[in-house]
Swiss-Prot record:
It is found in: Cytoplasm. It catalyses: a 2'-deoxyribonucleoside 5'-diphosphate + ATP = a 2'-deoxyribonucleoside 5'-triphosphate + ADP; a ribonucleoside 5'-diphosphate + ATP = a ribonucleoside 5'-triphosphate + ADP. PROSITE patterns: NDPK, NDPK_LIKE. It is an enzyme of class 2 (transferase). Pfam families: NDK. It comes from the Bacteria. The gene is ndk. This is Nucleoside diphosphate kinase. Its EC number is 2.7.4.6. Belongs to the NDK family. GO terms for biological process: CTP biosynthetic process; GTP biosynthetic process; UTP biosynthetic process. One of its GO terms (molecular function) is nucleoside diphosphate kinase activity. Its main location: cytoplasm.
């Protein structure tokens, strides 16, 4: 299996509760390397662009409002099969359905305030990484 990169966000409910280190520990325990990371406060425009695929969904406004409600930590994670591996580590979008040992089972508050985002495919990972990081900010 090839080494891949995926894009991750530690969401405002995680920064608000000061649990970014606890989440990073689960990421690293799974064998993923944090090869880029920065704490930012997303603008409304950045959040709308990032979640444009969900524009027609009824929760879009709520999702954007939440993502700009406080700081987030954006990351690039690297490792074998990183995209699928991180989705396994995150657990189901709805924390009530997330498996034991996953980030969302341990930390997410609700389907909206679900602590983390991870890319769903190589194409989206490349687009999401490029939205927030220049090539020279990623150090593998
Ligand atoms: P994420 O992986 O960041 O991708 C899209 C996000 O939309 C998802 O995580 C959830 O946080 C959010 N989301 C999905 N379904 C709902 C919903 N029914 N209500 C509010 N937010 C949702």
């Amino acid at each position: 299996m090839a080494i891949q990169r995926t894009f991750s966000i530690l969401k405002p409910d995680a920064t608000e509760r000061n649990i970014t280190g606890a989440i990073n520990a689960l990421i690293e325990k799974a064998g993923l390397r944090i090869v880029a990371q920065k704490r930012i406060h997303m603008t409304r425009g950045q959040a709308e662009t990032f979640y444009a695929v969900h524009k027609e969904r009824p929760f879009f406004g709520e999702l954007v409002d939440f993502m700009i409600s406080g700081p987030v930590v954006v990351q690039v994670l690297e490792g074998e099969n990183a995209i699928a591996k991180y989705r396994d580590v995150m657990g189901a979008t709805d924390p009530s359905k997330a498996a034991d040992g996953t980030i969302r089972k341990a930390h997410a508050k609700s389907i909206g305030e679900n602590s983390v985002h991870g890319s769903d495919a190589p194409e989206t990972a490349a687009i999401e990484i490029a939205q927030f990081f220049a090539g020279n900010e990623i150090v593998g």
